[in-house]
A protein has these predicted regions:
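Mono-ADP-ribosyltransferase
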Residues: 1-256
Length: 256
């Protein structure tokens, strides 16, 4: 608290009175501690271990929506000690379910803004951190599966009109090692008549296995989606398509 009092004295009374919650206090201390370490590095023992965040990482850490993901840094460091914890936290936040306090950190919002080209500070830093993490995570080569419901018009424009062509996506692409997870996504009731159920069978070359740090890893939640994530901008050959007996479209993609 003494160091913190020197760095940002205005917060001390709020901490002592319990107005600032512990998790917020911890992140705030880290935020100011980085500058303190940088400005006073000659006084810091060489064996003193501390995470000093860069500008991009600071922007991510100080967002309230990342608190849950950042609270798991000890776990990340045990699983992948060579990957910066903030990068792993960005992947975890991306995979979290939408909630009242976490609408803008999830895959749906991030991908929506990436695909629409809508500027947003959080999406910019989070997507950069996710891409950095993916470059360090285990590569998966083999077949993976993705389930999606989409309008006939969108299906036609994005895939059916491009058999034999190479296509790409401005957003990240989630998939699973097993068929059961995507089948759950497309088997939900209430799909409009104008939409079709689609299963993508993807031959992965550079997809990254995020199953250990995903929100749905069998530890943070009981469900394990065995997720393989493709970086934004990944290119795929639309090899072929077929229609199953129940009307589900199956699109075969080959990562380029």
């Amino acid at each position: 608290l003494k160091i913190f009092e020197t760095a940002c004295p205005a917060f001390v009374p709020l901490i002592e009175e319990g107005i600032i919650e512990n998790d917020i206090m911890d992140l705030t201390i880290q935020y100011y501690m980085d500058d303190f370490i940088r400005d006073n590095d000659k006084y810091i023992r060489e064996d003193f271990k501390v995470n000093v965040y860069n500008k991009t990482e600071k922007t991510f850490v100080r967002k309230r929506r990342t608190n849950l993901a950042m609270s798991r840094v000890e776990y990340y460091n045990k699983i992948y000690p060579h990957i910066p914890e903030v990068q792993q936290a960005a992947v975890n936040a991306y995979t979290q379910a939408i909630s009242s306090g976490n609408k803008g950190a999830t895959s749906r919002e991030i991908n929506r803004r990436l695909r629409n080209g809508t500027e947003d500070e959080y999406v910019d830093v989070a997507s950069r951190l996710i891409s950095q993490a993916l470059s360090r995570l285990p590569k998966y080569e083999g077949v993976v599966y993705r389930g999606e419901t989409m309008s006939i018009k969108k299906l036609q424009e994005r895939f059916l009109d491009h058999i034999g062509d190479v296509v790409s996506d401005k957003g990240f692409i989630s998939s699973s090692l097993y068929m059961d997870t995507p089948m759950k996504f497309i088997s939900r009731a209430g799909i409009p008549k104008s939409h079709k159920r689609v299963i993508f069978e993807i031959q992965s070359k550079n997809g990254r296995n995020i199953s250990n740090i995903s929100e749905f890893n069998g530890i943070f939640t009981l469900e394990n989606q065995h997720e393989i994530l493709f970086d934004k901008g990944t290119k795929f050959l639309v090899k072929k398509r077929r229609i199953e007996g129940d009307g589900t479209y199956r699109i075969i993609l080959v990562e380029q």
